[in-house]
Amino acid sequence: MAKYVPDIKTQRWVIIAATRTKRPSDEQKTKDNEQKAESNNQKIAIPAGKQESGHACPFCSGNESMTPPEVYRIGSGGPNETGWDVRVVPNLYPITDIHEVIIHSPSDTDDIEEMSLDQVTKIFTTYRDRYRANQDSGQVMIFCNHGLGAGASLKHPHSQLVVVPNQINLDAVEMEPMNNIIEEHVNFISYCPDFSQWPFEVWIAPKVKGKRFGEVTDEELPDLAGVVQDALKKINTALSDPMNAAFNREEHFIYNYYIYHGKNWFLRIIPRSIHRAGFELGTGLSVNIMDPTMAAEWLKRGKLA
């Protein structure tokens, strides 16, 4: 069971989840294999269904027996068999008592910005359905850590769903005004809020306010999938521009995104292009080296005017 420790003065909380130290790490496995290969003067071959580490990937099709029994799937085939398009399983190393892994596709390498719109729509359909299934149990947080530098322990593209008890106060940013608009779709708007804490941070929000994420309709899901995919493509292009060499590109496009858990929901994309240092950690203040107005213009036009 998760252990919650409060700070009485600020009503902020810490979750003690010691089992998380047991998570498998592709980064460490890859380093170990590279060292072995170098010592033997060999190249690493990557068989199907395995990561760069050379170890079997539990999220690849054909390796369903390596995960706990699934709780949801989109696609053909029976439970815990091949044929799925999106698959959801309990997390073996949970943060809280309800913690699920949403596997984006059978592919080990396809990222959201590279998938078909139909596949991305299936991912967001899964988000919506799992939100609905868990909303009576607490505050539902859906998030994606893309890349090892963004907190992912396994490279196979996936998201996570965590349920936090209602009595725990979440220190989460709420909806920001829709300034610096990038693009307007049928049901959603993408923008860079004035309160952007990260360079090229993008928010996506529904035009209709006052709703929770679980209220997104089947008709709205393809539009949402499209605006998120488009935003990720634009951010990646901007960060790849030589004029933005100041941003960290040690690893191919790393980012986090999450869906706000309560009313007036939004999706927030945070490119991890800079590192937080002592000043930010010590003061709680964020330093953004890219003006949100300029970021929105860049993302809208593909360059500064």
Question: Model-derived features: where do they sit?
Answer:
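Active-site microenvironments that recognize anionic phosphate/pyrophosphate groups
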Residues: 1-156, 162-212, 216-219, 232-235, ...
